[in-house]
Amino acid sequence: MATLRRLQEAPRHLLVCEKSNFGHDKSRHKHLVETHYHNYRVSFLIPECGLLSKELKSLVMDIGPYYSVKNLPLHELITHEFINTFVKKGSFSALTYNTSIDEDNTVALLPNGKLILSLDKDTYEETGLQGRPSRYSGRKSMKFVISIDLMDLSLNLDSKKYRRISWSFKEKKPLKFDFLLAWHPTGTEESTMMSYFSKYQIQEHQPKVALSTVRELQCPVLRSSGLAGEPEEACSALEFFDWLGAVFCSADLNNEPYNFISTYCCPQPSAVVAQAFLCTITGFILPEKIHVLLEQLCHYFDEPKLAPWVTLTVQGFADSPVAWREKEHGFHKGGEHLYNFVVFNNQDYWLQMAVGANDDCPP
């Protein structure tokens, strides 16, 4: 009976909400964006808008390329040349794709130079490297996590530690993966990813952009000062988060009696806007690009607008080994880790961060 009860229980999910102002010295918005490394979808919704401004449209269309490379040996990411060319001269991200975090070996390179390996027990033991059991592999540890600081390694390439890691990746347990790669250089000299990895199967990709206008959209009434909302006056942050998810899914918000797909309805109080502009960008999107987009959305209210707020939603890869910073991420039943900004016309904002069962509380 206890087993049946556990099976029927829904997995725990966490939603953390906070409010601040972009002008405050202690605002965490930039840090939260910069430390959510592996992003595959960015969406923004602008009420009372039928056409994007030139600045926003230009930014969306120039979000930057990313790359896919097949069968890339892992040792390529720890060479002196690679570290000096990419890791030390910008923000470089890499993530294995076509892999499942709860079943397969997965690897991520973070912009801070940390190489994270999530390996099954056999592979972990064969590498001969030191790591720790995964927090989400159960009583019998079947998954292990190895963290390698490339910046620290590069200080002494003749060290015993570097030689051991290099020997492991090249000879003892050579590993190859399909990777997604992206790079944001900090200087004027820009090496090309295509030429550097030319001996492998590498392709350049542009993010997919979907633009649409939602007509007669019923929107919750919000007050920037109150996350909890006020009865009959303003909706709560939680109600708004649910509503936004329904909008992104193109769900019917009217709860009509003949609708057997969705019984959801817009929280009250609400107001109908004639149109709202929805933009969705899908790819391998760097935090630096997202921060620029967030800043541009803040400037949307530099001139008077009918819209009381706009939103920016960012979803991470479900099979990334980390969510925020270097916190371990697991899949369980969804693998979700995402955040949403509600940007108000007075520069106040709500920040909503959501994770699934196999994650720490968002930072």
From Swiss-Prot:
Keywords: Nucleus, rRNA processing, tRNA processing. It is found in: Nucleus, Nucleolus. It comes from the Eukaryota. One of its GO terms (molecular function) is ribonuclease P RNA binding. Its main location: nucleus. GO terms for cellular component: multimeric ribonuclease P complex; nucleolar ribonuclease P complex. GO terms for biological process: rRNA processing; tRNA 5'-leader removal. The keyword rRNA processing applies. Component of nuclear RNase P and RNase MRP ribonucleoproteins. RNase P consists of a catalytic RNA moiety and about 10 protein subunits; POP1, POP4, POP5, POP7, RPP14, RPP21, RPP25, RPP30, RPP38 and RPP40. Within the RNase P complex, POP1, POP7 and RPP25 form the 'finger' subcomplex, POP5, RPP14, RPP40 and homodimeric RPP30 form the 'palm' subcomplex, and RPP21, POP4 and RPP38 form the 'wrist' subcomplex. All subunits of the RNase P complex interact with the catalytic RNA. Several subunits of RNase P are also part of the RNase MRP complex. Component of ribonuclease P, a ribonucleoprotein complex that generates mature tRNA molecules by cleaving their 5'-ends. Also a component of the MRP ribonuclease complex, which cleaves pre-rRNA sequences. This is Ribonuclease P protein subunit p40. It comes from Mus musculus (Mouse). The lineage of its organism: Eukaryota, Metazoa, Chordata, Craniata, Vertebrata. The gene is Rpp40.
